[in-house]
């Protein structure tokens, strides 16, 4: 029996850019859909990591003991806004569960506390976000700009975010697996 493609646009879905999407930051991006409603959608890019130097006034990097912190470009909108994706379920009043064991939210004191803990939770510190107006994401999906997959802790906090796009396509199997081998520069094909 053939696998039925995942086709549900909802919180906890992963959006994978079609290989022919050549839209700068969205090229080969994997986006965790954090909210999807009739009013619009927003998500965070998981596979575009950043090498950042952050002011000690904002985040005292010298006190970071948790090696599980990754800096990501969440998207092109409001790039100065910081959002936390993490695996800490202990502060439910400040966070929203996006998929099992993956949470969005928390404040600066929470971040500083878990960053100084050697055995802290997994954290994606995302700068900016990706957003769509009402109906826009649905149109892009129907136009073939995005493929969908269910999100998981393993995908969100993978050790190799640079390979996440092709890893998920391979896991989806079938035609998606063959798309995972398409070169970034289609002229090289």
Curated annotation (Swiss-Prot):
**Per the record, a Pfam family?**
DUF179
The record ties this protein, via Gene3D superfamilies, to: VC0467-like
Please, which domain of life does this record's source organism belong to? Bacteria
Q: List the GO terms this entry assigns under cellular component, sorted alphabetically.
A: cytosol
Q: Which InterPro entries match?
A: AlgH-like
Give the family from UniProt: Belongs to the UPF0301 (AlgH) family.
Q: What is this protein called?
A: UPF0301 protein CAB604
Could you read off the lineage of the organism from its UniProt record? Answer: Bacteria, Pseudomonadati, Chlamydiota, Chlamydiia, Chlamydiales
